[in-house]
Swiss-Prot record:
Example GO biological process: translation
Single GO cellular component term: cytosol
Species the sequence originates in: Mesomycoplasma hyopneumoniae (strain J / ATCC 25934 / NCTC 10110) (Mycoplasma hyopneumoniae)
Keywords from the named record: Ribonucleoprotein, Ribosomal protein, RNA-binding, rRNA-binding
One of the Pfam families matching this protein, by short name: Ribosomal_S20p
MF annotations from Gene Ontology: small ribosomal subunit rRNA binding; structural constituent of ribosome
Domain of life, source organism: Bacteria
Record function comment: Binds directly to 16S ribosomal RNA.
Protein name: Small ribosomal subunit protein bS20
Classification via PANTHER family: 30S RIBOSOMAL PROTEIN S20, SMALL RIBOSOMAL SUBUNIT PROTEIN BS20C
Family statement drawn from the similarity comment of this UniProt entry: Belongs to the bacterial ribosomal protein bS20 family.
Length: 90
């Protein structure tokens, strides 16, 4: 445990930031999971859930939780998953 007052404060700030970041990451994971389930089961609201997942990923990117490349990669992989399920097999 830190003895210096400023370090105690910085540890507290880091813990709060980590909790917020983990909450945002969890929201993103949940949104992606729901979208993938909707895509694979061909649910009627799959486009809404994909849009929600894109929105959550973009929010995480704008808040600095995800790097822009990571956010773009997640969006791209979700779109690829959606396209492979929606295009008919040849």
């Amino acid at each position: 445990m830190a003895n210096i007052k400023s370090k105690i404060k910085s540890i507290t700030k880091m813990q709060k930031a980590r909790a917020k970041n983990n909450a945002i990451k969890s929201r993103v994971k949940t949104a992606i999971k729901k979208a993938k389930i909707a895509i694979s089961t061909d649910a009627s609201n799959k486009s809404d859930l994909i849009a929600k997942a894109h929105s959550e990923i973009s929010k995480a990117k704008s808040k600095g939780v995800f790097h822009k490349n990571k956010a773009n990669r997640k969006i791209s992989r979700l779109n690829l998953f959606a396209n492979t399920y929606t295009t008919p097999a040849q």
